[in-house]
């Protein structure tokens, strides 16, 4: 299934916590994207979503801005170096958990690390 425009990218949305971003996404997400997150949990799906939904999340919520308040809080709380890819992947994982729980399904978040461990390669993802 090819995903179309996922978020309205014309207006960036600045929120102050990652939880606010997840809540916003949960409310505003298209039904098509919700069904994909509900159904697919393979590493290949994770990579595809990272390149589509993840990109849109990074752009919509200005995650590439290193002064982004939500990202700075997230990385400080998790003792991680800042990278927009890790924040968008965390958001996708949390959305998968939330949507699958709402539908009474097993909670199995996407894990890009599975792809890296399987192939032994690190892939540059924009």
Q: Residue spans of the language-model regions?
A:
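Compact alpha-helical subdomains of small soluble proteins
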Residues: 33-36, 40-124
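Short intrinsically disordered terminal tails
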Residues: 1, 123-126
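N-terminal export/targeting and maturation segments
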Residues: 1-37
């Amino acid at each position: 299934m090819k995903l179309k425009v996922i978020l309205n990218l014309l207006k960036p949305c600045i929120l102050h916590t990652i939880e606010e971003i997840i809540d916003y996404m949960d409310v505003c997400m298209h039904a098509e994207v919700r069904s994909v997150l509900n159904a697919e949990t393979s590493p290949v799906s994770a990579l595809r979503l990272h390149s589509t939904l993840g990109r849109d999340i990074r752009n919509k919520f200005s995650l590439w801005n290193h002064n982004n308040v939500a990202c700075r809080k997230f990385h400080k709380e998790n003792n991680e170096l800042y990278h927009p890819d890790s924040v968008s992947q965390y958001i996708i994982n949390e959305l998968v958990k939330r949507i699958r729980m709402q539908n009474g399904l097993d909670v199995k978040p996407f894990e890009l690390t599975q792809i890296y461990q399987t192939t032994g390669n690190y892939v540059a993802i924009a």
